[in-house]
Regions:
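A generic short alpha-helical patch detector that favors 3-5-residue windows
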Residues: 22-25, 63, 141, 154
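Flexible, glycine-rich terminal cap/loop adjacent to redox cofactors
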Residues: 58, 77-190
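Rossmann-like dinucleotide-binding cores of NAD(P)H-dependent redox enzymes
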Residues: 40-47, 53-90
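Short amphipathic alpha-helical segments
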Residues: 29, 71-72, 133
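FAD-site-proximal beta/loop scaffold in flavoenzymes
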Residues: 1-61
């Protein structure tokens, strides 16, 4: 507020600066990243926006804008909460026919051994293509685990590829695998 934006070609949407996928505003040579551009208000999103913006300004080739549905959301509490992509509701609203898998940490050997078996992992897939639409987690170290699904989404990995991925044992990440298997009625340990 009151920084002179009204004298520029910068556009606002509900108080946030409108940018293209590279941080450029409507005013030539003026860029914006981070919280001023709107949700999600996450440090890792802002940091990545800064990198993309600088790469674009520097004229680098193959700069990829952020896809909002691929930004991981993490809440650092106990139990931890993490997510990426669409929720079941949003996927249905977008017209997807979905498959959903869930796996509780109380059935994961590593979580039991750690004495931290509260929570679960849920995965949401496009029933037609097998695309991973979203993943949601509550439990031990899920703010670390979510990156596996972020990478899977960014590489456009399907459920078949995730089902055939070998997850080390005993690890918390095995719950990720079991959640994928559960979406296709193939869970092993629950």
């Amino acid at each position: 507020e009151n920084i002179g934006l009204e004298a520029t070609k910068v556009k606002l949407d509900r108080g946030h600066i409108v940018t293209d996928g590279y941080g450029a505003t409507g005013e030539a040579g003026l860029y914006a990243i981070g919280d001023v551009t709107g949700a999600p208000w996450l440090a890792h999103k802002a940091s990545h926006e800064g990198i993309i913006c600088i790469e674009k300004i520097a004229g680098m080739k193959h700069v990829h804008p952020i896809e909002d549905n691929s930004v991981p959301g993490c809440t650092y509490c106990r139990p931890q909460v993490a997510s990426v992509g669409l929720t079941e509701t949003k996927a249905k609203q977008a017209g997807y026919e979905i498959k959903v898998g869930k796996f509780p940490f109380l059935a994961n050997g590593k979580a039991i051994a750690l004495g931290d078996d509260e929570g679960l992992i849920k995965t949401i897939f496009d029933a037609k293509t097998g695309a991973l639409l979203g993943a949601h987690m509550i439990g031990p170290e899920v703010t670390e685990l979510i990156q596996g699904y972020v990478v899977a989404r960014s590489l456009e990995t399907t459920e078949a590829e995730l089902m055939h991925t070998i997850f080390p044992h005993p690890t918390l990440s095995e719950a990720m695998h079991e959640s994928v298997l559960d979406a296709y009625d193939r869970a092993i340990h629950f």
